[in-house]
Amino acid sequence: MQTVKHSAMALFLAVITFTAGAHPHSFISLKTELVTDGTQLSGLKMRWTMDEITSADLLYDAGNAKPGDEIWKKLAAEVMANVLGQHYFTEFWHNGQKVKFMNRPTEYGMSRDGHQAVLTFVLPLAHPQPLAGQTYTFSTFDPTYYVDMSYAKESDVTLPTTLHNSCKIAVHTANLSEETLNFAVSLDIEDA
């Protein structure tokens, strides 16, 4: 085992996804890339792929629209309004303190991937955070557990290639209590 003594950065990112194993009503597959300039973390570039049932209304409204057509911009704005109303469904922590986000994403869009709608956006931090020697944790989840938001594999959270040797990522999935799972099962669409 080789110890790297001169490492300028040690970033351990614990990504926690809360998955309601009992009976969520909607599913979103997450992918996230950290946005950095090499020394500071400025945001999270997210890709949310919705399940086919959740996607159905959006794709119906989009019809045969081509990527970049006006309808995709309109649909993306509608979905982002909901995401913003829920604080991006994301919490970001540093040293036990919540890190604030900017009120609006710096970019966002919607597209089709087969029979699934895909929302992409950059979730900007209100203030860039230093990377060197720091530990950050972020969680993306629906607090009602109506929507299962999860990473399929650890490689769904990525760093820029320039940080691969100096930073680490770990993805952790929450283990929900029986009480929480039962609550998730009891939810109706009006409760979400």
List where the protein language model places each region.
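Bacterial N-terminal signal peptides that target proteins for export
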Residues: 1-9
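Residues that act as N-cap/strand-start positions at coil-to-secondary-structure junctions
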Residues: 26-28, 86, 132
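Ordered hydrophobic segments in well-structured contexts
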Residues: 29, 43-47, 91, 118-122, ...
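Mature, soluble, non-transmembrane domains
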Residues: 95-192
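N-terminal signal peptide c-region/cleavage motif recognized by signal peptidases
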Residues: 17-19
